[in-house]
């Protein structure tokens, strides 16, 4: 399967944008402030630039223009170069590497200044592959009013599994920077299913008490209060659900450092849960763990159970990844199939455990869609007209077509041209959207 999607791209939240524009011969120039650009995920501001690192960190804005370019810089280079995916009106149009130094990158061209076009610039790989996003130049037009946020936010905290390490790899020789792509990971898929934005805080090798190499320090709890560049993070965004997926690297770390005990890890897990509750008093906290090993299951269960009086903290163990997929990504990490199955598994558990329900956009009932009017004049497949293509659009198209007499434009929703909108269209649409 991976051979067909090795160059695919596939989802958090603080809001930031471009309030000031400067006209030039090339077009109107904008800088990230706080008006017309939504920034989803963790970031820091340095002068006029926005520093981003974690996968799924996203700049989301609308333009009425002919083309859009953006100045991006980095001190990194292959095999640790930052990569970005660009979505135009919800459709993946390119994935590109940021070269060392500063350069101007074309995000979109051939647009119409008479129409609103949504642009999403999404970071795909690891935290330490940091880039600075600066000037946005809009030629033949201007930045328009932003699209509204999805209204729900999940935060996913984890290691390489959550960062989607090596998910696009076809062999062990492929470089990490291009094959690590969180847009295909379970965190993004789960957020789409929930109709939520996602704030991904995941880095390969990180553990609860110790990292993959046995180092007891610089773990995920130790860096949780920081932005990718090491500056302090404010925690002002309040997630509806926090999902912690840690413990896998502690197993490997214990194998390297024999002085580390499960008691050390249990204590660290309890401290981290207490920290999460301190900074996010209203979030539901879910610890999930499994896929690559299960040795820490009892440790996590003990840590979570110690907060039973909280009433909004739970543990969801995951099956081995072999139950989800026959294949693997790089270094035996979960592949795309396993990530999709993990998202489906967690989504079902979240519903069955009463953690999410009819109040979540991704959990739709007929009544929710009663007033929804399908507009085929909008972008391909954007059923809810939010300039984004996600599972909510697919569910809405499928449900509405089965329960009404409206005619669906086969150029907009009937992707396999069989005269009906069903799960086959959903599968094909998702596949086509992810293809590069």
What label would you give each PLM region?
Residues 19-24, 361-436:
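Cellulosome-associated attachment modules in secreted, modular CAZymes
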Residues 22-157, 162-179, 359-371:
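N-terminal secretory targeting modules
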Residues 160, 189-197, 201, 272-279, ...:
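Structured segments of extracytoplasmic/periplasmic soluble domains
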Residues 56, 127-128, 167, 172-258, ...:
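Conserved SGNH/GDSL esterase-like catalytic core that processes O-acyl groups on lipids
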Residues 4-23:
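Sec-dependent N-terminal signal peptides of Gram-positive bacterial secreted proteins and lipoproteins
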Residues 89, 222-357:
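Alpha-helical cap/lid subdomain in secreted, periplasmic
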Residues 198-203, 287-288, 357-363:
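Surface-exposed patches in mature extracellular/periplasmic domains of secreted proteins
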